[in-house]
Amino acid sequence: MGGISIWQLLIIVAIIVLLFGTKKLRTLGTDLGESVKGFKKAMAEDKSQDANFDKVEAKESTSTTEKTKEKEQA
């Protein structure tokens, strides 16, 4: 009472297979898998771009500090 049993889940899966067919479900599964791969790849690229941005930002702050010191000495 209250929960979904394994038999109810199996009946739901069987109905879905009958409605959509195995070919359509296979296509949907492939598309979903490719979407997840693309998302993970984009996240990995985004992390590397963030790391590069931090390096560039550190270089800019160092060069700005050096320019300030040069102006103070002049």
Curated annotation (Swiss-Prot):
Pfam families the UniProt entry points to: TatA_B_E (PF02416)
Localisation per UniProt entry: Cell inner membrane
Molecular functions per Gene Ontology: protein transmembrane transporter activity
Keywords: Cell inner membrane, Cell membrane, Membrane, Protein transport, Translocation, Transmembrane, Transmembrane helix, Transport
The organism's place on the tree of life at top rank: Bacteria
Record-level GO cellular component terms: TAT protein transport complex
Principal location class: membrane
Region (Disordered): 51-74
One GO BP annotation of this record: protein transport by the Tat complex
InterPro entries: TatA/B/E, TatA/E
Subunit (UniProt): The Tat system comprises two distinct complexes: a TatABC complex, containing multiple copies of TatA, TatB and TatC subunits, and a separate TatA complex, containing only TatA subunits. Substrates initially bind to the TatABC complex, which probably triggers association of the separate TatA complex to form the active translocon.
Protein name stated in the entry: Sec-independent protein translocase protein TatA
Organism: Haemophilus ducreyi (strain 35000HP / ATCC 700724)
